[in-house]
UniProtKB/Swiss-Prot annotation:
Detected in aorta smooth muscle and bladder. Belongs to the PP1 inhibitor family. This is Protein phosphatase 1 regulatory subunit 14A. Residues 127-137 have a biased composition (Polar residues). Its main location: cytoplasm. It comes from Sus scrofa. The gene is CPI17.
Length: 147
């Protein structure tokens, strides 16, 4: 019996409204923000795009290891999706990677496969300092990195 009471007490603390408070003590702030985002955009699509962006960042770091200064500022997924064919996308990606001394063929082919499942999301872009309307992966990481 005592174990049941203890279990109920722990469970009630985990479910208490004070645990659901968002930043600044507002109840459910984080939960409500997710709800608004997923109403406008499909959450699964957003997660897929994020996964592709993380994959691109990781692979670029591998390809340019030791030569980070030569790394392209960005690989804009929306620009690639706007192109008509995979051949055009492939040429665009290869143009971005022209300074890479490591083999890039596998990266290009894998990225083309990952792009097949994505759709252009024009509302997701935020203005960049360069004024072209997009953030580079490096700029985005710097903007969202913890202090």
């Amino acid at each position: 019996m005592a174990a049941q009471r203890l279990g109920k007490r722990v469970l009630s603390k985990l479910q208490s409204p004070s645990r659901a408070r968002g930043p600044g003590g507002s109840p459910g702030g984080l939960q409500k923000r997710h709800a608004r985002v997923t109403v406008k955009y499909d959450r699964r699509e957003l997660q897929r795009r994020l996964d592709v962006e993380k994959w691109i960042d990781g692979r670029l770091e591998e390809l340019y290891r030791g030569r980070e200064a030569d790394m392209p500022d960005e690989v804009n997924i929306d620009e690639l999706l706007e192109l008509e064919s995979e051949e055009e996308r492939s040429r665009k990606i290869q143009g971005l990677l022209k300074s890479c001394t490591n083999p890039t063929e596998n990266f290009v082919q894998e990225l083309l496969v990952k792009l097949r499942g994505l759709h252009k999301q024009p509302g997701l872009r935020q203005p960049s300092p360069s004024g072209d309307g997009s953030l580079s992966p490096r700029q985005d990481r710097a903007r969202t990195a913890p202090p």
